[in-house]
Amino acid sequence: MSLLTEVETPIRNGWECRCSDSSDPLVIAASIIGILHLILWILDRLFFKCISRRLKYGLKRGPSTEGVPESMREEYRQEQQSAVDVDDGHFVNIELE
């Protein structure tokens, strides 16, 4: 039962729910939409980094190497790796007095 369709009223014995007819198609649709929204929100929180990276960069994994000779591919890989190696060794040390 959806929380949106329940009405709690204080009576002598405590709190009870007086719910409208649950076979109403609008109530069923609202319940399904609410459950789907909750599931999607949980998945978004769990996989936020993966999803945002996928949307930002798309499905591309790098430049296409189709039709490029293997020797040129290897040369390109070495250039990319050397560029990464240079970046990894470049740090700035700051000393506070």
From Swiss-Prot:
GO terms for biological process: protein complex oligomerization; symbiont genome entry into host cell via pore formation in plasma membrane; symbiont-mediated suppression of host autophagy. The record marks W41 as: Seems to be involved in pH gating. Residues 44-97 are intravirion. The keyword Nuclease does not apply. Its main location: virion. The record marks H37 as: Essential for channel activity, possibly by being protonated during channel activation, and by forming the channel gate and the selective filter. A lipid is attached at C50 (S-palmitoyl cysteine). The M2 protein from most influenza A strains is inhibited by amantadine and rimantadine, resulting in viral uncoating incapacity. Emergence of amantadine-resistant variants is usually rapid. The modification Phosphoserine is found at S64, S82. One of its GO terms (molecular function) is proton transmembrane transporter activity. Residues 59-83 are annotated as: Disordered. It comes from the Viruses. Keywords: Disulfide bond, Host cell membrane, Host membrane, Host-virus interaction, Hydrogen ion transport, Inhibition of host autophagy by virus, Ion channel, Ion transport, Lipoprotein, Membrane, Palmitate, Phosphoprotein, Signal-anchor, Transmembrane, Transmembrane helix, Transport, Viral ion channel, Virion. Residues 1-22 are virion surface. It is a single-pass type III membrane protein. When the channel is activated, one or more imidazole moieties of His-37 probably become bi-protonated. Homotetramer; composed of two disulfide-linked dimers held together by non-covalent interactions. May interact with matrix protein 1. Belongs to the influenza viruses matrix protein M2 family. This is Matrix protein 2. The lineage of its organism: Viruses, Riboviria, Orthornavirae, Negarnaviricota, Polyploviricotina.
